């Protein structure tokens, strides 16, 4: 039986003072689908996904996840619903090592009465998850601030995937990684698609989006200007919508 979209965003808007960062945006994401949110820097992409993940509360509009309205839910509550987000700034604690970041706020405990953290189990869990994702991190005890951009991205992705995400949002995940890191990320997205886990993939790179997403939602100046299946459009057409030289047909 068709359960409908796992994520439904309906008419959401967000203001910061007199600036309308997101203006009446709607879209849906179905199981096993990779949807690209595409637009230039400053278009409102990150603000949009932060409303979905619970960081911001929409000023207008509604969001549903798995058939439930998410109004008032915090990022922690969204994670408990297994919607995981990898933010553009990665949201890592630089003074902690990889395993502590992966388990941050969800630490493994030796003793639930005295709240003693089980560092060994956390280290083993972090190592296994990073290995599964094919991210190389020679020293799990190194502080996150001392890691390369690709290694930091690997920790952020491992933090999301360790908890068996049902839905993953990735905000410009390849911005600070090299070629090998990009390959790992593209493979992860493909593997999630095969498992039926939907992905919202945020990027300003149209060619990158065309290589991995099923459907493109173009955001320009806070508004959704067009939505296209990538197999039914071209890179040039989508670029035209991004820069404003093309208009969606009414």
Q: What does each model-found stretch correspond to?
A:
Residues 2-250:
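Glycine-rich phosphate-binding loops of nucleotide-dependent enzymes
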């Amino acid at each position: 039986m068709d359960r409908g979209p796992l994520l439904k965003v309906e008419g959401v808007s967000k203001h910061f003072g007199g600036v309308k960062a997101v203006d009446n945006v709607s879209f849906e994401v179905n199981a096993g689908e990779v949807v690209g949110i595409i637009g230039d820097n400053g278009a409102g992409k990150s603000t949009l996904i932060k409303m979905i993940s619970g960081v911001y509360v929409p000023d207008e509009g509604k969001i549903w996840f798995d058939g439930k309205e998410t109004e008032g839910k915090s990022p922690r509550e969204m994670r408990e619903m297994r919607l995981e987000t990898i933010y553009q700034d990665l949201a890592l604690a630089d003074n902690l090592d990889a395993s502590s970041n992966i388990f941050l706020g969800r630490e493994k405990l030796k003793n639930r009465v005295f709240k003693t953290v089980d560092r060994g189990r956390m280290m083993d869990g972090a190592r296994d998850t990073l290995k599964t994702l094919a991210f190389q991190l020679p020293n799990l005890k190194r502080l996150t601030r001392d890691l390369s951009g690709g290694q930091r991205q690997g920790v952020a992705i491992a933090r999301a995937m360790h908890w068996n995400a049902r839905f993953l949002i990735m905000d410009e995940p390849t911005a600070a990684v090299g070629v090998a890191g990009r390959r790992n990320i593209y493979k992860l997205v493909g593997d999630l698609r095969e498992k039926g886990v939907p992905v919202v993939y945020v990027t300003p790179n149209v060619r990158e989006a065309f290589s991995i997403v099923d459907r493109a939602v173009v955001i320009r100046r806070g508004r959704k200007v067009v939505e296209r299946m990538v197999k039914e459009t071209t890179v040039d057409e989508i670029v035209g919508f991004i820069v404003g030289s093309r208009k969606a047909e009414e």
